[in-house]
């Protein structure tokens, strides 16, 4: 990986927000940000002695992908939980397997699992991750929060841009205490969470690529009044708040029994009377069984929706009713982001295609997430980039002046892309290619190769030297 990000690049094609353009020069400052973009015929760069751009022939640049929802430690379950002695396996039977891992894990194992997950994300084009982190304590009796800094250390080594979303997890369900392995998750109150956030804020391994946010694990695990307190303080601090919402029907049933309302109803009540976009900065993860009209209201109140298609399929959760929600509010499409969640498979391109494919299967029609031009791929790319950045409060997700130079380089000679025209390249990648079409990624202008063992083209050797 190169030591200095400064310099200029000119790939064969660069995504500039609506299309791929040829010959765009990207000038990257010493701070790892894009100083300017210069299109062919766009005039001279600042200063007559501007260095020539390093050409990247047969490469196309995209913004680095933003993974808005991850549980890195769950990579340790890969290959497990896929055997059922009888029909009827579901999220809850998988969760029992996950709790077994939680009970066994120590700092070294957590570091290795997190590092492996983050490196795999980089190879899949993911340059930023929102780590929804509730596995806090090595010693639950001491409430040591020993695992929080382990995850940050793994992210720094990978390296990957991370927002550590520190979770409040107070109960095993409404009115039920945490038991067994769950005790490693324990953060009882918003005050305890914010004290830990403040402590971690002074210990970030790299403040330029690491930041913090808050989580209410769910309205099963955190009572509504505590969620309200977390939301209020998160808004005051200007940090994101994420929570699982209506992934499982049992979650809905338990909340109705305890509080008389569904989780999304409770969440919408928190935003009532809060002025314009009272739920801005709040991201609801999954929303698998959320009523379409409530999804639309949540988005109109400023909320964002994180869908994790591969994990939701793996666990048999279901498919969120996005098509019906879009009929009620077209703004839903622009509020979407994506996550790899359980990390059973790490591929943002595949998450993006299944965001659309799941809706096609559910509704038996195509083009559910199409934009005004009738294209689906730009909506999917936005969910995988700028949508995730907005959900995490990051300045990433676009190739634009002033943004970090977090980039993905596609190999235009890859068999899945070689016949695609520039006008169809995004569709060819998202619907027809795998992560092996990713040649390299850049984090703040510093490049790393794609998949381990992948051949490095001569054009990239100077970047990766």
Predicted ranges, named:
Residues 404-453, 460:
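C-terminal cap of metal-dependent C-N hydrolases
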Residues 290-293, 299-329, 334-340:
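A conserved active-site cap/scaffold subdomain adjacent to cofactor or substrate pockets
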Residues 12, 32, 58, 69, ...:
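Divalent metal-coordination and catalytic microenvironments
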Residues 1-48, 60-61, 446:
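N-terminal metal-binding scaffold of metallo-dependent hydrolase/deaminase domains
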Residues 63-75, 240-249:
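Histidine-centered catalytic micro-motifs
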Residues 79-161, 192-207, 465:
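Alpha-helical scaffold segments that flank or form the walls of functional sites
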Residues 137-288:
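Metal-coordinating catalytic core of metallo-dependent amide/deamination hydrolases
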């Amino acid at each position: 990986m190169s030591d200095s990000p400064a310099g200029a690049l000119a790939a064969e094609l660069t995504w500039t927000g609506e299309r791929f353009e040829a010959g765009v020069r990207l000038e990257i400052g010493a701070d790892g940000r894009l100083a300017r973009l210069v299109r062919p015929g766009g005039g001279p760069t600042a200063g007559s002695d501007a260095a020539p751009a390093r050409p990247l022939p047969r490469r196309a640049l995209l913004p680095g992908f933003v993974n808005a929802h991850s549980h890195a430690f769950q990579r340790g379950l890969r290959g497990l939980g896929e055997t059922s002695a009888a029909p009827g396996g579901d999220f809850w039977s998988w969760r029992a397997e996950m709790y077994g891992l939680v009970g066994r894990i120590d700092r070294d194992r957590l570091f290795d699992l997190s590092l492996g997950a983050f490196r795999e994300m980089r190879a899949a084009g993911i340059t930023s991750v929102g780590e929804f982190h509730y596995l806090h304590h090595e010693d639950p009796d001491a409430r040591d929060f020993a695992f929080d800094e382990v995850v940050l250390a793994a992210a720094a080594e990978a390296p990957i841009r991370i927002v550590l979303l520190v979770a409040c997890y107070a109960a095993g369900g409404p009115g039920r205490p945490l038991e067994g392995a769950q005790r490693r998750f324990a953060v009882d109150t918003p005050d305890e969470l914010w004290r830990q956030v403040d402590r971690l804020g002074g210990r970030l391994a790299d403040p330029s690529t690491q930041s913090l946010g808050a989580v209410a694990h769910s309205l099963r695990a955190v009572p509504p009044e505590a969620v309200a307190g977390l939301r209020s303080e998160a808004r005051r601090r200007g940090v994101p708040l994420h929570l699982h919402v209506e992934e499982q029907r049992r979650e809905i049933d338990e909340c109705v029994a305890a509080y008389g309302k569904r989780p999304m109803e409770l969440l919408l009540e928190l935003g009532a009377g809060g002025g314009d976009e009272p739920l801005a900065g709040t991201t609801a993860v999954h929303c698998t069984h959320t009523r379409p009209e409530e999804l639309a209201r949540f988005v109109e109140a400023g909320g964002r929706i994180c869908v994790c298609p591969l994990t939701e399929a793996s666990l048999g959760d279901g498919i969120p009713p996005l098509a019906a929600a879009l009929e009620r509010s077209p703004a839903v499409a622009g509020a979407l982001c994506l996550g790899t969640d359980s990390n059973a498979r790490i591929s943002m391109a595949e998450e993006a295609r299944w965001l659309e494919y799941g809706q096609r299967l559910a509704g038996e029609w195509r083009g559910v997430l199409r934009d005004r031009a009738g294209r689906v791929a730009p909506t999917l790319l936005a969910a995988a980039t700028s949508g995730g950045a907005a959900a995490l409060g990051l300045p990433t997700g676009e190739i634009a002046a002033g943004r970090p130079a977090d980039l993905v380089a596609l190999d235009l000679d890859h068999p899945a892309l070689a016949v695609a025209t520039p006008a169809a390249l995004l569709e060819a990648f998202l619907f027809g290619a795998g992560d092996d079409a990713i040649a390299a990624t850049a984090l703040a202008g510093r490049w790393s190769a794609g998949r381990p063992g992948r051949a490095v083209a001569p054009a990239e050797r100077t970047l990766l030297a």
